[in-house]
């Protein structure tokens, strides 16, 4: 009798978990926008308690609606949130997902700049990975307007703030001549 009850319980538990996953609500753009409204507090400061949840909502929307024209935008915004959360691995994952699924989106090259500068260079202080991100932008998007920025960022890798400032001043003086 106990064995039958245990078996029945396990079967019901399994059926319940399947039913829950099948009835998972499909997110709409309105759901995403509602989540977005919770991201900033009244002082326009990121609500760090809600940030991870909002980023997950963005990612879930993209997963459920991969052909929606706004999908690349939400992936990029999820990446931005994860930059603020200092979640480097998730940023890299989202950047790669964005480039792989939406290579023609203008958000793809932007994600490489974000990944290279804020994640690899600033947070991880890994100039080799930053260089790879910038070079990937140059190689995969040679006609994009951010290529010149990527080239400058490569030249600035490893420089101190003072050296970067001197480099900018020197280039401005050369332009004036």
Where on the chain are the PLM-derived regions?
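Short solvent-exposed coil/turn linkers within tandem alpha-helical repeat scaffolds
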Residues: 61-71, 85, 100-108, 124, ...
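C-terminal motif of bacterial Sec signal peptides marking the signal peptidase cleavage site
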Residues: 16-19
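TPR repeat positional signature
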Residues: 31, 35, 75, 112-113, ...
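Residue at a conserved register position within TPR or TPR-like alpha-solenoid repeats
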Residues: 82, 119-120, 158
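Alpha-helical segment of the N-proximal tetratricopeptide repeat
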Residues: 30-60, 64-65, 84-85
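Bacterial signal peptide processing site
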Residues: 21-23
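Structural register within alpha-helical repeat arrays
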Residues: 78, 115-116, 154
């Amino acid at each position: 009798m106990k064995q039958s009850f245990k078996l029945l319980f396990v079967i019901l538990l399994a059926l319940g978990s399947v039913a829950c996953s099948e009835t998972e609500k499909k997110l709409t753009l309105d759901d995403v926008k509602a989540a977005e409204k919770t991201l900033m507090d009244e002082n326009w400061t990121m609500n760090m308690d809600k940030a991870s949840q909002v980023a997950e909502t963005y990612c879930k929307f993209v997963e459920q609606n991969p052909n929606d024209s706004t999908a690349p935008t939400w992936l990029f915004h999820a990446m931005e949130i994860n930059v603020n959360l200092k979640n480097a691995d998730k940023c890299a994952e989202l950047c790669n997902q964005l480039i792989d699924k939406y290579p023609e989106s203008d958000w793809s090259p932007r994600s490489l700049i974000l990944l290279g500068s804020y994640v690899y260079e600033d947070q991880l202080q890994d100039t080799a990975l930053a260089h790879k991100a910038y070079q990937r932008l140059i190689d995969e998007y040679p006609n994009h307007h951010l290529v010149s920025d990527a080239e400058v960022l490569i030249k600035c890798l490893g420089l101190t703030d003072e050296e970067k400032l001197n480099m900018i001043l020197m280039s401005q003086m050369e332009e004036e001549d």
